[in-house]
Amino acid sequence: MRGAGQSVARFVTLGLPLGLRLLLLLCFVVVTSAKTSTPAFAAGDEPKYQALNPRGNPPDVSLVPLSPRLTDLNDKTVFVVHAWPANVPSGFEPVVERLIAGLKTKYPGINLVTRYKDAAYSEDEPELWTQVKREAAAFIYVPADSAATTMWSVTWSAGLEKMGVPGVVLHFAALAENAEVTRTKLGTPIRLVEVPNHSGSGDGNAADVTDAVAAALVSPLTDAERATGTRHSEPPPRIGVTGTLAEIQDFFYAQHWTDGLPIIPPTEENVAAMLKGTKHAASEIVTKAMLPEGWPVTVEKVAINAVMAGATPNEMPVLLAAIEAFGSGHFASSVRSTNSFSFMQLVNGPIAREIGMNSGTYALGPGNRANATIGRALRLFIYNLGGGENGVNLMGTQGNVGSYAFCFAENEAASPWEPFQVSRGFERDDSTITVFAGGWSHTGNMLHQDLHRLARDIAYFQWPSGIVALLAPATANALAQSGMSKAKVEEELWRNATLTMGEFRNDHYYQRFIIPILKGKEMNGLRDRWPASYLNLPDDARVQVYPRDDVHVVVVGGEANAMMQGWAMWGATTVSIDKWR
């Protein structure tokens, strides 16, 4: 039986590419072991493979020493800087209230000045930093129960330390590792004070961090905190592990190098075959700052992870373009957010047909190799090439099923309108990939409903920064036959996705993100996304919720019925795939 099993295994894999042979062997081992009590291979006789290491290499970091500490807080001005607006609960309110009272008791002469960022927590605010440097002897930075806010709070605090102002950052216990990896990446050993989770719940038991905060501001610097120079990053060993298929699976999983699903071992032969899918050199840098930790990424490292995902060489240009788009920096907050965002990848142009992507029936579901592997690969890139790790810097409180694989092609053949890439400034024959962030809210199955129903539903999505309406071909063609262009459909959705100004104004996303923009601040490099007149409108005025430029229509799906889906998606970043062929 054992010999017969080995003969069958060798026969069914004869002449196939190594990647496919490995997958068939893995399936054969599992199925044979499940059906019989006899192992597929004799003990010690299983084939072994050398799997390349999929991990990227963090960049070298310039070490920035902390500013000298104060000797006493009496007669000193200390700024308490809040990342979130005054009327949006951060979770720290009772803690900060007790802290201020404690510091005033401990240092009767202290002058505590409370300041709230005018810009969103993720945006640089040079005017505020200059004021802190000019007026404060020290600062206390207060983030929120938010991974992205904590990361940005540590980032801006590092800048203040570099300007010569000593400080400390509070953080909740659940976000301790998130704060730690951020200060490690920055090379500035910001002093952190941990607060128990939900200590700001208002039950009268807020944590007292007075002594810890005071110590952070007055305790002398350690040698590590005074260190300068460069922290060099040693590249990982080329070979990740040598072992059987099962051993490779177990090892990669234990190292947090997978998404939990089985992978194709990235052997030298498999990776060399994958690299034939692009003319670009293996050592070429695709992006210098892959998220979440800003690592540089080479073409070869993309190929290694592409093999793991089950991709083919023909898909390699799409994956390289996806890395370029994701490494643009627009998604720094979304990728580590506690809000459980996901990322949607849309492929347009001839390459979608060339690699057999599904744009029709079940396009958003399982069953198509290219859709699944391209979608899956992005999550492996985030883990292995961007330094992501669940519970450390990937902090989605509940997670998102779209994080496994959310990739499809537009059904250009069945669409009555120009394809998506044309609306982004490309030609119809250009192949592109567009990456969106969001996926937290969606509505669907809009069978035979008009656009007003869809607009009404999407108006109530949280974080109203963008919307993608996915229209089945029957829906799109019916609208086109009624005389509507794609731009007109987008206009109708934007115009009718409204709330009263009072409803809009009371949402804390409006307070956190939209008010700063209305007051002229930038967000992700953009201004004027909503009219400044919103600031003065009465509560009963009806207003458009979304920025007009962030309402998009894409045609996807089969011909069986007229369906629509609305997805909360924003930050559309479109790049050329053709440049990576």
Each model region followed by its residue ranges:
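N-terminal secretory signal peptides that target proteins for export/translocation
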Residues: 1-18
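Bacterial N-terminal signal peptides
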Residues: 15-33
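Short N-terminal or domain-adjacent regulatory/targeting segments
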Residues: 41-73
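Short beta-strand segments enriched in small/hydrophobic residues
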Residues: 75-87
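Short beta-strand elements in bilobed, periplasmic/extracellular small-molecule ligand-binding domains
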Residues: 105-118, 190-196
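Glycine-rich, charge-decorated loop segments at or immediately adjacent to ligand/cofactor-binding or catalytic sites
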Residues: 175-187
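A charged, well-structured terminal subsegment
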Residues: 195-226
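Non-transmembrane, aqueous-exposed alpha-helical and coiled segments at domain scale
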Residues: 231-581
